[in-house]
Amino acid sequence: MKKLTLLTVCMALVLSICSGHGIAAQKNTVPEELKQNLEDAYIYAFPLVLMDATETSATNTETAVAGKAPVNQFIHARELVDAKFKNVVTPNVDTIYSQVWYDLSSEPMIYELPETDRFCKVQVLDAWTNTAAVLDKAGPYAITKADWQGDLPKGVTRVDVPTSMAWSITRTLLSGQEDLSNVHAIQKQMKLMPLSAYMSADNYQPAKGSYNEANNYVPINKVLSMSPAEFFNKANELMENNPPAAEDKEIIAKIAKINVGPGQKFSSNILGKNPQTQWNNMLQQIRPKLNGEASKYFQKLGQWDYYGAPIGDFGQEYNYRALVAMAGLGANTVDVAIYPKTEVDNQGNFLTGEHSYILHFDRFPPVLEGGFWSITAYGEDDFLIDNPLNRYCINDRSDLKVNADGTVDIVLAQQAPENITNWLPVSKGRFHLFMRIYTPDMQALSKWIAPTIILK
């Protein structure tokens, strides 16, 4: 997941958009109740609109190519990322992704997950960014809109999603460049087809997609630059096939007052004489609101912080849902993975390549069967750090030297130490670390002593 640093970038874009419209010279004249309803509606609908924009961009192709594929087809990542990779911030170097954007409006899609010798889990998300299911056993699954009525073949497991739009992210564990061919073989065994094709047993060929130059955009930039009418009418349209949850009835009744909801028609006229200026003013004020909400969801692990429950299955925590969407779509629930971060040493000073540090483990992170862990270093720009070894993380697959007492020390330094076995290269300037713990043992985690970072 792209972390909170991306939220800062996103909201900086909001501020630049706002300043371009002369917002400072304008006084906000929108009545307080209307302003609150607009803000609540925006925060509520933001993940839905961003999911749609992301799908539109990711499926904007006639055939499957690197990073894109038509609806209901696999988008298989094929390469291990390195320091040259700049497409997304805080890239994951532990797993290879296989994604699908689904249209479930006509019939279920059958996803056949093969047997593997490694961590390989399929996260299925609905249009509102909630995790509908996590698939981790081999076999055929029917990814199905919840209101679909029909019979499935024997042996096929039904997976209900409450919306027509859905997204799956399959994460397959990778143990370095030499392991890529094994991951490619697993990807080749993954199968996806409509239920009708699965039942007919014919040789299925997916339909050709389409390409539109106008849809070749960065999704977050696209959504943040929408006018109020564009944003809310897109949300209204999407809510017809991707209905709000039953427990959302209170906020749906509230935002219906400004014509936001399934089948509604929003007009910018309610914003007065300068709707775009008033809109930009509102977006600017949302930034401190969401940032202020962030801290209450933080969980501590020693000097590390991570986003805790209900991440990935948000319920009525709409502010949290919007915050995480801005920081990066596809967040796992905590039982699947947690992502602790630190940017300081054990004295609270920012980490910088001007110094060398010892990352000290008393014990490695506790994981359940099939789980794994890693620690990755990122520069101040949130990208991987170039180094002569092309080593970007240390993990449970690293051949680390263990101290006599069973502890492990990792050297964090720009320059290589005499023994490079336990060296994690860092940047010249400031840097930070992300720990990824997949399938964590949450009970043991509460008693676990997280690694400390000590200035050498």
Regions found by a protein language model. Give the residues of each.
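Bacterial N-terminal signal peptides that target proteins for export
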Residues: 1-8
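Bacterial N-terminal signal peptides
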Residues: 8-17
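Sec/Tat signal peptide C-region and signal peptidase I cleavage site
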Residues: 20-24
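A compositional/structural signature for long, glycine/proline-rich flexible linkers
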Residues: 25-456
